[in-house]
Amino acid sequence: MLVIFLGILGLLANQVLGLPTQAGGHLRSTDNPPEEELKYWCTYMESCKFCWECTHGLCKNKVNESMPTIIENSYLTSCEVSRWYNQCTYDEGNGHYHVMDCSDPVPHNRPHRLRMKIYKKEDL
């Protein structure tokens, strides 16, 4: 009974958070999440490369227009994301992971923002 309740709760959480219920709500590890999920994944870990569109070393956030244009550097990380039941995971490589409850997400942006280089016209 508890398992059924938790399963239903997980499916409801996915719908509330805007996550599709593909393959039972699971998402295999990928560095290219579905377009309709970018807003979710990029809100809680905005330094992932898949969240940014870069041209000639300048990068603009794909989902958050209030983010400044940045200079492409080590701020952007090659993340892989996955979802198994209600567990959302960001794999940053080098053994660094951010794991959170999908229905109660916790941003993991601060440590990365320290490396962000905001573009200014004088930089050209």
UniProtKB/Swiss-Prot annotation:
Q: Which sites does the entry annotate for glycosylation?
A: 64
Annotated disulfide bonds? none
Q: Which UniProt keywords apply?
A: Early protein, Glycoprotein, Signal, Virion
Q: Which family does it belong to?
A: Belongs to the asfivirus MGF 110 family.
Description of what induces expression: Expressed in the early phase of the viral replicative cycle.
Q: Where is the signal peptide?
A: 1-28
Compartments, as annotated in UniProt: Virion; Host endoplasmic reticulum-Golgi intermediate compartment
Give the InterPro entries listed for this entry: ASFV_fam_110
Organism for this UniProt entry: African swine fever virus (isolate Pig/Kenya/KEN-50/1950)
Respond yes or no to whether keyword Glycoprotein is given for this record: yes
**What is one term from the GO cellular component aspect held by the record?**
host cell endoplasmic reticulum-Golgi intermediate compartment
Purpose of the protein? Causes the redistribution of lumenal ER protein to an enlarged ERGIC compartment.
- Locus of motif Prevents secretion from ER: 121-124
A Pfam short name: v110
Name of the molecule in the record = Protein MGF 110-4L
Decide whether keyword Signal is in the record. yes
